[in-house]
């Protein structure tokens, strides 16, 4: 089964459920989907004042959680899948530690949807979707994730550039979409936030939310 780890935040718990539902809906292969809940992972690092989510650092534990074997995907929870994730499973990882969408992203806003500071740094948003070759990411031990800087982790310092491959850009479109989009990422805030309820591409998330909630009704009625 293709392993997928979704970053989980207590403020956006339903977002993770909606993403999970959208992944399963469109997938032609079996998926093993897990949530990265910080309270269950044994990290002891103090909260970074610049981190905007509970999974800012937990994403880098994925190779450790996979015993540094096989492939796995990490995804932020503020996404909706519109394509078959098998396309990522089919990507060749020979000689690569990672594949990511290599954005050249420079946000215009100075703050995020929840009031956190919007920092700008090289390779911003590259770590929001990662296809990992876990056997080549032994650098990311639990101790390293617990102690290293955000700069070291999010910029993939210590990983040679030639070991960082690309994922097609259709698999992580930032706050927009078209007919080719496979995964939309509401990185500036989605319609679940009051201040973003009129997001120009929010309809995709609202539709996925309604489908997810509808999927719960038969079980609730039966109970």
Roles of regions detected by a PLM:
Residues 48-51, 114-119:
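Short, P/G- and charge-enriched loop/turn segments at secondary-structure junctions
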Residues 100-112, 118, 124-126, 141:
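A gly/proline- and charged-residue-enriched helix-loop-helix capping module
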Residues 1-5, 11, 29, 33-37, ...:
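A glycosyltransferase accessory/donor-loop signature
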Residues 60, 126-129, 181-183:
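Extracellular structured ligand-interaction cores
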């Amino acid at each position: 089964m293709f392993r997928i780890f979704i970053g989980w935040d207590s403020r956006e718990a339903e977002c993770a459920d909606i993403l999970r539902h959208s992944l399963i809906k469109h997938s032609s292969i079996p998926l093993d989907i897990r949530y990265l809940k910080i309270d269950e992972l044994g990290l002891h690092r103090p909260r970074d004042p610049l981190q905007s989510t509970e999974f800012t650092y937990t994403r880098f534990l994925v190779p450790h959680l996979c015993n540094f074997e096989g492939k796995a995907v990490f995804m932020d929870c503020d996404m909706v899948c519109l394509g078959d994730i098998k396309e990522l499973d089919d990507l060749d990882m020979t000689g690569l530690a990672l594949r990511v969408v290599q954005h050249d992203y420079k946000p215009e806003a100075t703050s995020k949807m929840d009031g956190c500071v919007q920092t700008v740094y090289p390779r911003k948003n590259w770590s929001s979707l990662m296809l990992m070759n876990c056997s080549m990411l032994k650098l990311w031990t639990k101790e390293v994730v617990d102690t290293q800087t955000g700069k070291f982790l999010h910029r993939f310092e210590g990983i040679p550039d030639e070991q960082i491959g690309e994922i097609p850009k259709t698999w992580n479109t930032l706050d927009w979409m078209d007919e080719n989009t496979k995964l939309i990422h509401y990185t500036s805030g989605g319609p679940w936030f009051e201040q973003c309820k009129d997001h120009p591409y929010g309809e995709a998330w609202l539709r996925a939310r309604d489908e997810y909630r509808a999927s719960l009704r038969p079980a609730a009625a039966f109970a």
